[in-house]
Amino acid sequence: DAETHRNIWSWDPYTACVPAAQQGWFVNPSEVKPVFNRRYILMTASGGAVALIRLSDHKLMFYANCGQNPHSAEVLPDGNIVSAESKSGEINTFVVDTVKVLGEKANTVKLGNAHNVVWDKKRSYLYATATKKEGVTALFRFKYDGNRSNPKLINQTTLYTFSNESGGHDLFPVYGEEDKLWLTAASAVYKFDLTGVTDATTNDSTEPTCEKVYSIADIKSICNGPDGIRMLKPTEEWWAEGLVNEKGEELFKMDGAKIYKGRWMIDNLFSYPEKHDFVLSED
């Protein structure tokens, strides 16, 4: 709880009865997106896991291994999942099957140092940042072919290339500002404005505008909501015990925790419809 700093919900692979050989996949959580109207959590972990967990009863609905160091994941319009994995530089798609529960990679796109994926429901694009070459970070977009049983990302396009920025970390919608995305990188925090970017029915590749908002280095995650901005600024190699605002003021702390990301529990209308139901697989 952001106000009381108390733990009001938790999940672990042991009590969820994940097989022992796969429990290590869930070491060091690296993403915690509330999805499907905040009834589920989409998570990744540095041990390799991508997973969808139902909040009400802690049920593990789907999970898979997406590589050596995944940093984020996203829900596609048909309920399938896509992940970003940095070690091998992969954007992987998965067929979500809640009967089988355990899944595997369906298709892979190579994208160097991939750290993030965000769906744009207005334009029907998936966005991701990656390293084109050392010291050069770029924003990419993909179309989704919509094949529920064999999901693929197609039509890769470079939307924006930084002249002097590296290490794209978190890409996340800006609450309250339509068409905008946060990006945290090695030297600063930016906002992309996608207003001029057309939808996926065209082949137009209009470049978004990019504004440096905060000259704060190495922010691992950022999100905002009605109660302001929350950032994860590492106090150790990649983690901290709490979250701060844009002024560096501590807002939340869990003693002994190794936090990599923090998300407000609010609906993400940039990526998902206002009414966003999760459909269970049939036997």
Regions found by a protein language model. Name each.
Residues 35, 42-47, 82-87, 128-133, ...:
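Conserved beta-strand positions in repeat-built beta-propeller and related beta-rich domains
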Residues 5-41, 45-48, 56-72:
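Blade-loop segments of beta-propeller domains
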Residues 6-23, 58-64, 101-109, 154-163, ...:
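A short beta-strand motif characteristic of beta-propeller blades
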Residues 37-40, 78-80, 122-124, 177-179, ...:
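Short coil/turn segments that connect the beta-strands within blades of beta-propeller domains
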Residues 164-247:
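Loop/turn-rich, solvent-exposed surfaces of beta-rich toroidal or solenoidal domains
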Residues 21-33, 67-76, 111-118, 163-176, ...:
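Repeated scaffold domains used in trafficking and secretory/extracellular systems
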Residues 2-3, 95-100, 142-152, 193-206:
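Short loop/turn segments immediately following beta-strands, especially the blade-tip
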